[in-house]
């Protein structure tokens, strides 16, 4: 049976403590599909912002230069609005997608806005991103691993497919979010088990196993809920067959630099 299935999933992080304030925005995101299919749709989130977000234009293409790009709409409107505290699905577009297909999403906004739903990677072979503070600009992607490659709002890409994949979750702290560990595994699964597995990345840099983020510094607040809390809440709604976790260093280190974390440990 043909159905919508997640072909790419990177769970957005709450950056409301350190929002990105932009007069204008353009961002280019490279994703790699775990599944083959004939149609595509995007999930865009604004869970953590204080106001609605407006994107004037969103496009999808198979090349980074965005030649032969297709316009993405939501409710058949070119201007896409993401209500505060919500997520939306775009309308589907026809696109012939193969396993391992590289897809580029180009999003533009001329509105002065704060972006709080954020995700990033350092390893760029399968997922990459770049953004600029101008609406009329196509950002260039960099392949260097020394700097963070971040993007806003895009959390999931689904394809209309006959495949019925199992889900593998990778989660924990920065080691899992950065992609150095997960990218080889993802590439292996695409090659050896095409159309059978989709990897879900729900890691958060700075995350701890037991305690939620301390609040004595804005950067600490971005570390989010404890992994135990997040796994119970399961915001993604997926039921992974297997979850791979790498976490623990921040449980040891944060109490050394944060008074709030030190009190949490003592309690």
Model-based region annotation:
Residues 61, 164-266:
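Conserved SGNH/GDSL esterase-like catalytic core that processes O-acyl groups on lipids
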């Amino acid at each position: 049976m043909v159905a919508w299935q997640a072909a790419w999933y990177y769970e957005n992080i709450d950056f409301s403590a350190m929002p990105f304030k932009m007069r204008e925005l353009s961002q280019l995101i490279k994703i790699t599909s775990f599944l083959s299919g004939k149609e595509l749709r995007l999930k865009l989130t604004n869970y953590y912002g204080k106001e609605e977000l407006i994107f004037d234009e969103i496009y999808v293409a198979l090349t980074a230069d965005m030649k032969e790009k297709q316009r993405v709409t939501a409710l058949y409107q070119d201007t896409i609005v993401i209500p505060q505290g919500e997520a939306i699905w775009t309308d589907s577009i026809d696109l012939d997608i193969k396993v391992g297909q590289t897809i580029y999403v180009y999003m533009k906004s001329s509105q002065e806005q704060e972006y709080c739903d954020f995700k990033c990677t350092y390893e760029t072979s399968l997922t990459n991103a770049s953004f600029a503070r101008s609406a009329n600009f196509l950002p260039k992607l960099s392949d260097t691993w020394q700097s963070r490659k971040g993007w806003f709002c895009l959390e999931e890409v689904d394809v209309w497919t006959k495949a019925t994949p199992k889900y593998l979750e990778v989660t924990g702290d920065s080691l899992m979010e950065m992609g150095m560990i997960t990218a080889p595994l993802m590439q292996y699964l695409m090659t050896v088990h095409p159309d059978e597995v989709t990897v879900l990345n729900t890691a958060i840099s700075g995350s701890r196993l037991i305690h939620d983020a301390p609040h004595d510094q804005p950067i600490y607040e971005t570390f989010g809920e404890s992994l135990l809390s997040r796994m119970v809440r399961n915001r993604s709604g997926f039921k992974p067959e297997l979850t791979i976790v790498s976490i623990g260093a921040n449980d040891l280190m944060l109490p050394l630099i944060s008074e709030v974390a030190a009190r949490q440990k003592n309690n």
